[in-house]
Amino acid sequence: MAIPVESFFLAPGGQGSLQHRLRQMVTEGILSGRFRPGDRMPSTRALAAHLGVARITVTLAYADLVASDYLLARGRSGTFVSAAAPDARKARPLPRDGARTDWARLLHPRAQGLPRPDRPRDWSLYRYPFIYGQADPELFDHQNWRACALQALGRREFHRLSADCYDEDDPLLVEYILRHILPRRGIAAVPSEVLITMGAQNGLWLAAQVLLGPGERAAMENPGYPGTRAVLGTTGAEVLSVDVDDRGLVPAQLPARLKLVVTTASHHCPTNATLPVERRLALLAAAEAGDFLILEDDYEFEMSFLQSAAPSLKSLDAGGRVVHVGSFSKSLFPGLRLGYLVAPAPFVAAVRALRATVLRHPPGQLQRTLALFLSLGHYDALVARMKAAYRLRREVMTKAIEDNGLQIAGQGGFGGSSFWMQAPGAVDTEDLALRLRAEGVLIEPGRVFFDPARERRNFYRLAYSSIGPAAIPEGIARIARALR
């Protein structure tokens, strides 16, 4: 790749001759890894004109660097970074001015210590990846997605993509959500009550930012989705944990003086429990009596292959106190980063203004591609294929778990893509996960799902969204052997 001439500049007041400073600039670029073997250097004429120096200065500097094996001259083809140049990975790190900056003091405490997923970046190379939230590329409809993406880039659609829509969403995508997605959750809404988000995590963040601040109180499930705890923590509000049982959140245990309750009512994360109707009604009644709002993270309802998914909490919301957050990441692919938020129009207007301040709107090309994929029926066909695959994988995993004597702590009744598991009390599943990586097995330790003040270390999650049925039995057997 060609190195842009703009990559080079001479700092005012530099020490040494122009030729020396130019050599130093190139060697620092190579040693830092910015310039890589095979990259083509700017021509001597172009670099001299850019820096405002004589061409002979650049020519002599290049000649010295060729003699030192930093650069390689290839005649009329140009000058390139040499493969014999020192390896940037082995070179001593160059001193940076930022090292003198006290970032621990300058960064706000809320920006420090935010959780990061504890999984290797190369997870797909492991033979037994029982990790949640990753897609199996073998199931995805690449051909039709590509066709929809090309159509979205066509002349007929491009006029919208090329405009700055400021805070507006793709009307075709909003219409499909209103007419096809929300009715499946028992929700009736109008366009002013829907906002497109950059995935469920972004929806949770937007909602929390417009609702909470220092001195206010929010409650979430324990165990619960780690991303919720991180989002609530960024607001400065007091975050309280409410223990769940085998049926989910217990409304009677909610603390007083709340501003917000976050729940995964239809499919609790991570236990997979579904909140019964009587508890849903009790939660809504508590919201009315206590004057708080409910943030419903309604994930993975599409994967209901054992029985129909329970209606959303929002479908029972007569008082307008539920903010409903949904996502397409689990049913399409996590890298899509598109979802939606449904709430009363005044709330959506406030969130839309915040979103516009941060990122205007999600990419128009992605929105239109998804809208076409949905409206042409490809999405429903994909979901049907995934449900069939997940049903088979769940059956295989259930048998493997039983055959190996592992203990299921939560599996849900409608489907999903994971099991919540419990190891013997003395087992630390973070240590277990490290040992299993050497065996080619990836699991999710359960500690991160719990309130840090009441953490449990002997739980873990096993997902089957990214592992084929043929690999499941051996992967489960390796987990069982590691637990013995």
UniProtKB/Swiss-Prot annotation:
The keyword GTP-binding does not apply. Residues 44-63 bind DNA. Its cofactor is pyridoxal 5'-phosphate. One of its GO terms (biological process) is biosynthetic process. GO terms for molecular function: DNA binding; DNA-binding transcription factor activity; pyridoxal phosphate binding; transaminase activity. Keywords: Activator, Aminotransferase, DNA-binding, Pyridoxal phosphate, Transcription, Transcription regulation, Transferase. Induction: Induced by taurine. Positively autoregulated. It holds the Pfam family Aminotran_1_2. The modification N6-(pyridoxal phosphate)lysine is found at K330. It comes from the Bacteria. Residues 16-84 form the HTH gntR-type domain. In vitro, taurine does not influence the binding of TauR to the tpa promoter. Transcriptional activator, which is essential for taurine-dependent expression of the tpa-tauR-xsc operon. Acts by binding to direct repeats in the promoter region. In the C-terminal section; belongs to the class-I pyridoxal-phosphate-dependent aminotransferase family. PANTHER family: HTH-TYPE TRANSCRIPTIONAL REGULATORY PROTEIN GABR (PTHR46577:SF1). This is HTH-type transcriptional regulator TauR. The gene is tauR.
